[in-house]
Curated annotation (Swiss-Prot):
One of its GO terms (cellular component) is host cell plasma membrane. This is RING finger protein Z. Late-budding domains (L domains) are short sequence motifs essential for viral particle budding. They recruit proteins of the host ESCRT machinery (Endosomal Sorting Complex Required for Transport) or ESCRT-associated proteins. Keywords: Host cell membrane, Host cytoplasm, Host membrane, Host-virus interaction, Lipoprotein, Membrane, Metal-binding, Myristate, Viral budding, Viral budding via the host ESCRT complexes, Viral release from host cell, Virion, Zinc, Zinc-finger. One of its GO terms (biological process) is viral budding via host ESCRT complex. A lipid is attached at residue 2 (N-myristoyl glycine). A zinc finger (RING-type) spans 34-70. Residues 85-99 have a biased composition (Pro residues). The gene is Z. HAMAP family: ARENA_Z.
Length: 99
């Protein structure tokens, strides 16, 4: 008695994050390292104003969805800086098998 009917809850808003860039090799950036482990320079992902390596990003996403460095949401969608390439197909057939 005396209780007001509950209001229907609004659906949760989804945060549409833009894709973060994945840099395969950051040696051309100068002294850019992963801000979490300070070791990796390859496979860096841009997170706001710093970079994280894939290993640290994966580990951090298992704990929280916020970056411990900048407090912004961690990137979950990636955009490749360079398209992946494959070696050219061989023009000749491999030698026949001989035991």
């Amino acid at each position: 008695m005396g209780q007001k009917p509950s209001k229907p809850k609004a659906p949760p808003t989804t945060y549409e994050s833009p894709r973060s860039s994945l840099t395969p090799d950051a040696t051309g950036f100068g002294p850019e390292f992963c801000k979490s482990c300070w070791f990796e320079r390859k496979g860096l992902i841009k997170c706001q104003n710093h970079y994280l390596c894939m290993t640290c990003l994966t580990l951090l996403l298992t704990v929280s969805n916020r970056c411990p460095v900048c407090k912004y949401p961690l990137p979950t969608k990636l955009r490749l800086e360079k398209s992946p390439t494959a070696p050219p197909p061989e023009a000749t057939n491999p030698p026949p098998y001989s035991p």
